[in-house]
């Protein structure tokens, strides 16, 4: 199974051992090949993606009648987009709401982090929350809301995740997410550091994964905040939606 680890010392040693046996052919299998594609010529790549999978699922019965559809259990993904530019005018550009600016942070005199546009962040949280006046918003939508008990929110950066976790975790009647357990796995940016080898990066990933698994097991509603961690090579069945806020 090929991932970023093929570039590590251990990965190179394993590959070198295989190459010593010249009668072998090497097949790299990966579900997240984004960072290793440059290792191969386009003629050496077989591509099978989500769209192909769903097409095979839909066509199986007509092409292979009276046989079990091996793709039947693979979920269909629904992508929803929301235009809230009229409600967040001060942070909206020609191509839509600028999440990087909305969630921009600054360091205060006491060395803590806070949102530069905190009032707008709180406005946004209220807008998408369960009590929103706009009932098309995800957590205010009677059809969608029951499916959003455990979600992943992808935010622009580590400090944005930290500051957002503090706001979402407030025990306040004005907080539409007060009944959710907030799991911030963005950390301090350590897993993305070039100074850490693959062993250390894996350790951070496993720790984050265990925290999420514990939370979804012990709590009815959770929100996981991440700026990259647990977004590749990880399956958490309880997650049934991702909010892309970056």
Question: Where are these predicted regions, by residue range?
Answer:
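Interdomain helical connector at the RecA1-RecA2 junction of SF1/SF2 helicase-like NTPases
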Residues: 25, 37-152, 165
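Short glycine-/polar-rich loops that comprise or flank the Walker A/P-loop
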Residues: 21-25, 73-77, 178-180, 237-241
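Conserved catalytic network of the ASCE P-loop NTPase/AAA+ motor domain
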Residues: 17-23, 70-73, 143-146, 214-219, ...
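A short beta-strand-to-loop transition that corresponds to the Sensor-1 phosphate-sensing loop
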Residues: 29-33, 83, 157, 226-229
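A short beta-strand element within the Helicase C-terminal
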Residues: 222-226, 232-246
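Switch/connector loops and helix/strand junctions flanking conserved nucleotide-binding motifs
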Residues: 4-6, 35-40, 88-91, 191-194, ...
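Conserved C-terminal RecA-like helicase domain
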Residues: 101-226
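SF2 helicase catalytic motif II
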Residues: 1-28, 32-33
């Amino acid at each position: 199974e090929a991932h970023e680890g093929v570039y590590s010392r251990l990965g190179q040693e394993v590959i070198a051992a295989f190459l010593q046996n010249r009668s072998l052919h090497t097949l790299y299998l990966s579900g997240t090949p984004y960072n290793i594609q440059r290792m191969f010529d386009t003629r050496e790549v077989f591509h099978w993606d989500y769209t192909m999978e769903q097409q095979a699922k839909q066509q199986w019965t007509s092409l292979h009648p009276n046989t079990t559809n091996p793709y039947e259990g693979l979920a269909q993904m629904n992508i929803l987009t929301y235009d809230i530019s009229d409600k967040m005018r001060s942070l909206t550009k020609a191509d839509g709401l600028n999440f990087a600016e909305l969630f921009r942070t600054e360091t205060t005199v006491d060395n803590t982090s806070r949102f530069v546009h905190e009032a707008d962040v709180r406005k946004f949280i209220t807008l998408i929350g369960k009590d929103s006046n706009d009932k098309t918003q995800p957590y205010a939508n009677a059809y969608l809301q029951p499916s959003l008990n455990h979600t992943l929110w992808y935010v622009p950066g580590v400090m944005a995740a930290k500051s957002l976790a503090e706001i979402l975790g407030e025990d306040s009647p004005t907080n539409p997410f007060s009944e959710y357990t907030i799991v911030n796995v963005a950390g301090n940016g350590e897993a993305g550091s070039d100074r850490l080898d693959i062993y250390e990066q894996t350790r951070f990933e496993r720790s984050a994964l265990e925290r999420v698994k514990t939370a979804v097991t012990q709590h009815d509603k959770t929100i996981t905040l991440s700026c990259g961690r647990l977004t590749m090579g990880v399956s958490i069945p309880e997650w049934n939606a991702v909010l892309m806020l970056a």
